[in-house]
Every structure is written in structure tokens, then in C-alpha cells.
Amino acid sequence: MSVAASIYLPQFTIGETAFDGFKNEMGKFGNRVAVIHGERAWKASSQYILPALEKAELSVTGTVLYGHEATHRNAERITEDPCVREADMLLAVGGGKCLDTVKLAADHLGKPVFTIPTIASNCAPITKISIMYHEDGSFCDIPRLAQVPVHCFIDPRVILEAPVCYFRAGIGDAMAKFVESQWSAKAGERLDYGSELGITSGSMCFYPMLRDGEKALHDLEKKQVTEELENVILNIVISPGIVSVSVHPHYNGGIAHALFYGLTSRKHIEENHLHGEVVSYGTLVSLMLDKDFEKLSNVYEFHQAIGL
């Protein structure tokens, strides 16, 4: 008898009217929402989010600063907050560390969580894992969660307010997802459906970046919402997330991220380099070890062009 397998694919909305979907998506779970956010993230996005919540007739039980690091203690503190306990659902607003912290808190509480990424730098807005750190910023562990976030809302105007360095690093992180999953599946064993789906989808993290990445970066610098910019945002946030939630854990990682976890145990690297910057170096190492010199050359030239 076969073993049951489930895949929960992410749902998302992107566009300057993305928050108009609050009522349809969040209203299914009640009308009380606690907003947990990063400090800079809230300053950049609250002008769009609060009116949209009011328009959707959703009552905000409170706004809570998540902390400054994705730690288990911060997740516990969120679960203990009265406005969070009172809420029907949680809305996480911020970067990857904020979203992972809120996702873990929601998992502990058994409450639905919605996400609004304010930077395009990783797939945390839609995955069912949380990458957690110690108070000093060193890597701790990766708890697996019961569910993916219910819905991810992406307003590109919010992404435009973030420093360009996060977007650049996000491109590097996404491209690693394709290289790592391809490498991990090289043993030749028959893939289960989910793994084949995820690894095939992983090409969206790579080839469109080579095509659109440089222009999208320039568009971001000029604060212009373009088709290329939105495509790259989706291929940073959504495409690698589809890989993550679909593939068997054996294929969800590789040399690039292993190097990241090792290198960031060095304080000067953890403090001075973004996740995607370190991972992009690991991508080059992975391609070198794989002797895929054509991809190595293409990726190296692309990294040089965008400043990775």
C-alpha cells in the first residue's frame, strides 16, 4: 500500500492593488488580525496596509515588533502577547527573519498566518519551515511547520522602498535553489512526483534571472515597477518556495547553503554579509565541484554584472 503524500502549494497575489485581496483571503478566518512586523518594514508599508485592512473591515488587535533576530525566544514572546492571542489570524510584515519568526509563532498557536514581504530576498513568505538563529546571530535550527502561510501579498511599491542590496542578495539566493536541487538529484534515483515537480520548477529560479535580473535591478534603483521587476520578485519569493514545499528534504539544499551555515559561524561574515551574498559564493563552488564550467562562467559573469 502506498504512503499518502500531501503538497501544499503557496498562494500569492502580486501588484499595486494586491492588498485589495485582504477581505476575500483573510475574511474567511474571522475579522481580528494581529500585525507582527519589522521596524523598518512597518515604516515602509503601514501607509498601504492599514487603509487596506480598514477597507476589508478587519479589526487590528495590535501591532507588535517581532524583535531583531529570528530566535525561538522572540517566537515565544509573540505567542504570549495578548493582542496575538486575541486575534483570529496573524499578519507578518517584514523580511525573511521576521516572517520566519511569526510563522513559527503561528504554528505554536495553531493560528493561520498571512505574509507581506517588504524586501525580495528569499522564499520565507511562502515556505513551511522557519530558519532560526541564536541571539548572537549564529544559526540555530530549522523547525518544520504544519502548514505553509495561507496567502502571500506582494505590493511592488513596498519592495521599491527596500535597500537594493537585499534584492541583489535575493537573486543570488534564488539561483542557488536551482543549482542545489539539480545537484542533489544527480544520483539518478527515480524521483517522487513532488521532487520532480519542485526540481523542474527550479529552473524558474535560474534562467529568467540571467535574462531579467540586471534590468530588474536597475529598475529597482530607479524605483520603477516594470514587468521584469515583478518577474524577478516572483522568481526570488515564489519559485524557490515552490521548490522548497514540493521536493523531498534530501533535495532541498546543498553545498551553497551548507557553506552559508558554516561560514556564518564566523561573526565577521554573519555581521557583514547578507544571506544571498554568501549563498551566491556557494553556488560558484557547487558549479566548480560539478565541473559545469559553462554554467559557472555564465553565473560568474552575471554576478559581476549585478555586483554580487
Language-model regions, residue ranges each:
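Solvent-exposed alpha-helices and their adjacent loops that cap or buttress functional pockets
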Residues: 4-6, 28, 82-85, 106, ...
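A short, small-residue-rich loop immediately preceding and capping a beta-strand
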Residues: 82-105, 109-118
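Active-site segments that bind and position negatively charged phosphate/pyrophosphate groups
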Residues: 192-300, 304
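Short glycine/serine/threonine-rich phosphate/pyrophosphate-binding segments
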Residues: 42-46, 97-103, 123-126, 252
